[in-house]
């Protein structure tokens, strides 16, 4: 298996074979994200991808049960190529149960509902959509490249195709001020409308080399404190009414790991936040937070 540059995956894909289909992110304009800044986006040649599958078959002995398609936006590939990759994977790994990928909202919207359903039928079982926020104001500010309406359409299109929809939201993305509350309430509203199966809340980290980091250094962006980040998380939980949704905030960026099913576990998780805010439960120290 061959890889170009640093490889990222969701925490839940730690057991997966990571197959790099694209290099970098086709959007790569988000002001907060430093993951792919060192990569010029391109799609790997199909010949190399299929060779990697055969190499992985030999390495794993055909016994792999999960595969994750890297980098940030494999769904942008041509439909026929994606189907070929999926078919080769399920042929190479007879025990394969699911193939997953990140799904950029703009790239997702280039696929019709029928095309996404076809990908699901060929074994694309899960998509991770970086929603980050439901606020148009914040989406524009961080150069996400889509409107809230387009983000909602991308998520609904994936879910309605039968693909298991996992979304990521970013606590603290709006910084301090009036936009903070709008960010959280609009995000909760989008979750209620999008109806994902899983929501992963991550906490903003200012990454050197990103425009948001530069804005912070120049005094144009004021980040929230750890306590304010937890207050945002609590507000989010209190305003998600659709269920059942599996909710986690166990990513290394978070100050307090949480896990539960909404809305059944809302009270338990908000109580855990209150305990941390009162100083009764320790929060993850800054030096232990990571991407």
Regions found by a protein language model. Name each.
Residues 25, 33, 49, 69, ...:
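Conserved, mostly hydrophobic/aromatic
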Residues 106, 134-138, 159-183, 202-208, ...:
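Conserved strand-turn element in the central/C-terminal portion of the radical SAM core barrel
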Residues 22, 116-134, 163, 169, ...:
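Non-cysteine beta-strand/loop elements that form the S-adenosyl-L-methionine
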Residues 1-13, 189-291:
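Auxiliary Fe-S-binding modules of radical SAM enzymes
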Residues 114-116, 175-193:
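Catalytic cores of alpha/beta
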Residues 57-160, 241-242:
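Conserved SAM/AdoMet-binding glycine-rich loop
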Residues 5-51:
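Canonical Radical SAM [4Fe-4S] cluster-binding loop centered on the CxxxCxxC motif
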């Amino acid at each position: 298996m061959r890889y170009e540059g640093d490889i990222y995956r969701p925490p839940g894909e730690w057991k997966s074979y990571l197959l790099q289909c694209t290099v970098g992110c086709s959007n790569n304009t988000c002001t907060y994200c430093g993951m792919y800044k060192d990569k010029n986006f391109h799609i790997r040649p199909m010949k190399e991808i299929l060779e990697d599958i055969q190499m992985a078959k030999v390495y794993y002995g055909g016994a792999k049960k999960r595969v994750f398609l890297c980098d940030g936006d494999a769904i942008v590939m041509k439909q026929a190529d994606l189907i070929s990759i999926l078919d080769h994977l399920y042929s190479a790994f007879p025990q394969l149960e699911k193939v997953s990928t990140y799904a950029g909202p703009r790239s997702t919207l280039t696929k019709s509902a029928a095309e996404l359903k076809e990908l699901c039928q060929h074994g694309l079982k899960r998509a991770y959509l970086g929603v980050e926020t439901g606020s148009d104001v914040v989406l524009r500010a961080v150069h996400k490249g889509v409107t809230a309406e387009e983000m909602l359409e991308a998520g609904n299109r994936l879910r309605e195709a039968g693909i298991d929809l996992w979304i990521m939201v970013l606590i603290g993305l709006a910084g301090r001020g009036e936009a903070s509350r709008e960010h959280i309430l609009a995000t909760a509203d989008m979750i209620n409308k999008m109806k994902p199966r899983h929501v992963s809340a991550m906490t903003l980290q200012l990454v050197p080399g990103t425009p948001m980091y530069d804005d912070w250094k120049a005094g144009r962006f004021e980040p929230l404190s750890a306590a304010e980040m937890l207050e945002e998380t609590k507000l989010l939980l209190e305003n998600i009414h659709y269920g059942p949704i599996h909710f986690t905030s166990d990513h290394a960026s978070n100050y307090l790991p949480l896990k539960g099913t909404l809305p059944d576990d809302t009270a338990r998780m908000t109580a855990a936040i209150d305990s941390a805010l009162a100083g009764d439960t320790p929060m993850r120290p800054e030096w232990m937070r990571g991407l």
